[in-house]
């Protein structure tokens, strides 16, 4: 159960990488991206499960399918990410369908299996219809969704936990709690051990269930995140 409450260094690196990618995309003409999304509005979406989406399979090495007619992505951008606190250098992969980012992930080595995957494409949805851009107030009402505030020892406060099954989460980690209404946000910030380690264990088992009204009307699904690191 500790895995739910704690984020290890690789997961933090993943979040930082995803965040930097989102900022980088602001340089793309938003009207062009929106036009492409609207043009493909009637296209049947790719379905994301905890096993992956399309040719992107979790627990398997990455196989570049950008030159095929699969349609999930047609461009791969490679790079490196150095996470100084862990002295860790990782290979980064960002996949695009024209100008729209589809997904990103990091690998320790080229042939390492994909164990974490962040999906940001509006052309991908869960089996229950939840997709990027959908209001959170609507998303959390869909079948199989779980939404709560859970205590996180690293941040010493409550964080938003929105999940679909065991390994698939929405919006990764939102320690800023910006998607919540002010009243609900205060409840999360009050979930703290105040530096007293004796109280931490008491908080670990507690959670606050979230309703659609706990989210701001403008809060939306920004990404999906699959984490399969802890499986044997």
What feature does the model see in each segment?
Residues 1-7:
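Positively charged n-region of N-terminal signal peptides that target proteins for export
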Residues 21-156, 160-166, 175-180, 185-186, ...:
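Short helix/turn-capping signatures at newly exposed starts of structured segments
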Residues 197:
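Short regulatory "switch" loops immediately downstream of catalytic or recognition motifs
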Residues 170:
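A short macromolecule-binding patch
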Residues 15-18:
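C-terminal motif of bacterial Sec signal peptides marking the signal peptidase cleavage site
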């Amino acid at each position: 159960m500790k895995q739910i409450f704690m984020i290890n260094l690789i997961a933090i690196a993943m979040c930082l990488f995803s965040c930097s990618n989102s900022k980088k995309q602001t340089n793309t003409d938003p009207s062009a991206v929106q036009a492409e999304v609207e043009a493909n509005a009637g296209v049947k979406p790719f379905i994301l499960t905890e096993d992956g989406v399309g040719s992107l399979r979790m627990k398997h090495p990455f196989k570049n399918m950008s030159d095929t007619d699969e349609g999930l992505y047609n461009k791969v951008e490679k790079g490196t990410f150095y996470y100084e606190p862990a002295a860790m250098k990782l290979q980064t992969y960002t996949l695009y369908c024209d100008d729209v980012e589809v997904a990103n992930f990091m690998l320790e080595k080229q042939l390492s299996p994909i164990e974490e995957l962040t999906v940001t494409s509006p052309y991908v949805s869960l089996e229950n219809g939840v997709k990027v851009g959908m209001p959170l107030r609507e998303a959390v009402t869909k079948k199989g969704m779980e939404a709560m505030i859970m205590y996180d020892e690293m941040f010493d406060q409550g964080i938003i936990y929105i999940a679909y099954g065991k390994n698939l989460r929405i919006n990764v980690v939102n320690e800023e709690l910006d998607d919540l209404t002010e009243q609900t946000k205060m409840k999360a910030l009050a979930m703290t051990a105040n530096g007293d380690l004796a109280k931490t264990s008491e908080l670990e088992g507690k959670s606050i269930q979230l309703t659609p009204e706990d989210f701001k009307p403008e809060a939306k699904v920004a990404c999906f995140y699959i984490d399969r690191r802890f499986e044997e």
